[in-house]
């Protein structure tokens, strides 16, 4: 599911480094997390939507790679990010 402009602005204002930040790893991970949560809710209702399930797996993989990068570059930023997002890693 695509995010609306308002949802994107809300996520970026909370997790971005500045107001117009869309490229930092934190902002990207937060956007992916929002999309993953929305898609997970969709798949709970539409169990046979395998096309969306594959898209979900791709998003999870992309988020995992970005988190691995943040962990490698700055472990404190990584710990702060997963705590703020409520991820299990």
Swiss-Prot record:
Its Gene Ontology cellular component terms are: cytosolic small ribosomal subunit
Recorded GO MF terms? rRNA binding; structural constituent of ribosome
Q: Which GO terms describe its biological process?
A: translation
Tell me the leader sequence span.
none
Biased composition range(s): Basic and acidic residues? 1-21
Key word Ribosomal protein present in the record?
Answer: yes
SMART domains annotated for this entry?
Ribosomal_S15 (SM01387)
Residue pairs linked by disulfide bridges in the UniProt entry: none
Recorded hits in InterPro entries, A to Z, give: Ribosomal_uS15 (IPR000589), Ribosomal_uS15_bac-type (IPR005290), uS15_NS1_RNA-bd_sf (IPR009068)
Q: Where is this region: Disordered?
A: 1-24
Could you tell me the keywords of this UniProt record?
Ribonucleoprotein, Ribosomal protein, RNA-binding, rRNA-binding
Q: Pfam families per the record? A: Ribosomal_S15
Alphabetical list of Gene3D superfamilies matching this protein: 6.10.250.3130, S15/NS1, RNA-binding
> Which family is this sequence assigned to?
Belongs to the universal ribosomal protein uS15 family.
Query: Oligomeric state and partners?
Result: Part of the 30S ribosomal subunit. Forms a bridge to the 50S subunit in the 70S ribosome, contacting the 23S rRNA.
The family database entries (NCBIfam families) matched by this protein are listed as:
S15_bact
Question: What is this protein's function per UniProt?
Answer: One of the primary rRNA binding proteins, it binds directly to 16S rRNA where it helps nucleate assembly of the platform of the 30S subunit by binding and bridging several RNA helices of the 16S rRNA.
State the name under which the record lists this protein.
Answer: Small ribosomal subunit protein uS15
Give the source species. Answer: Rhodococcus jostii (strain RHA1)
Quick one: which gene encodes this? rpsO
